[in-house]
Amino acid sequence: MRIALGIEYDGNGYFGWQRQAEVDSVQGQLERALSIVANEPIGVFCAGRTDAGVHATGQVVHFETNAIRNEGAWTLGVNANLPDNIAVRWVKEVDDSFHARFSATARRYRYVIYNHSFRPGILRHGVSHYHGDIDADRMHQAAQALLGEQDFTSFRAVQCQSKTPFRNVHCVNVTRQGMYVIVDIAANAFLHHMVRNIVGSLLEIGLGNQPLTWMGDLLALKDRNQAAATAKPHGLYLVDVTYPEQYQLPKLALGPLFMLD
């Protein structure tokens, strides 16, 4: 049978999502816990591979198993065998047409900036700290140039392996909640480091170092070297993945949980 899981994790301390030899990964920890509960080797497929230090509240995975277990075993049982910073949020049996990556029609990320003169203590691994006077309204206005299907070469990592630089951004909003500035962006898919590269450039606009037209200018240049530095990883969360209605997957609060949704 094929099972889908909703996963939440704190990416701090992991070398990203993907299983790698001799380093700790989210995928490796999840597969270990699932294999214990299923009493057989389990391999998982995810909706989107996150980098080192990046978090998720809405990661979706699927796996195949011959084990017959109830919902409690796949949630409480797996959680009991996971580190405290990884948790199963929901479970659902799906038909064989479902694939966590290839069935997805959109992904949504939130980037959380702690905008204060002094760095945070408790949330130091859950937000990215930037001081200076950040104008969120200015960032939001500039970000609208990203909407639609466009060539995002200026915002892709050098090591990005995607065959095409084109992505379709469905919506992007920048808002302020007290000391937090949140960049919320959804697209059909994202290039490697695309969100963090976009945020890095939006910050330059928010700080008044670049004009409102800069995002559009960068898109036209198609040159990563012309854009700003990549934003820090700790503020980035994969918060939602969209699938066709036929799969009836659960929908929970996007998070992260310390924010107003």
From Swiss-Prot:
Species whose genome carries this gene: Shewanella baltica (strain OS185)
Function: Formation of pseudouridine at positions 38, 39 and 40 in the anticodon stem and loop of transfer RNAs.
CDD domains documented for this protein: PseudoU_synth_EcTruA (cd02570)
Catalytic activity, EC: 5.4.99.12
Protein name: tRNA pseudouridine synthase A
Binding residues for substrate: Y109
Biological classification of the source: Bacteria, Pseudomonadati, Pseudomonadota, Gammaproteobacteria, Alteromonadales
Cross-referenced Pfam families: PseudoU_synth_1
Matching InterPro entries: PsdUridine_synth_cat_dom_sf, PsdUridine_synth_TruA, PsdUridine_synth_TruA_a/b_dom, PsdUridine_synth_TruA_C, TruA/RsuA/RluB/E/F_N
Active site: D51 (nucleophile)
Keywords: Isomerase, tRNA processing
NCBIfam families: hisT_truA
Record GO terms (molecular function): RNA binding; tRNA pseudouridine(38-40) synthase activity
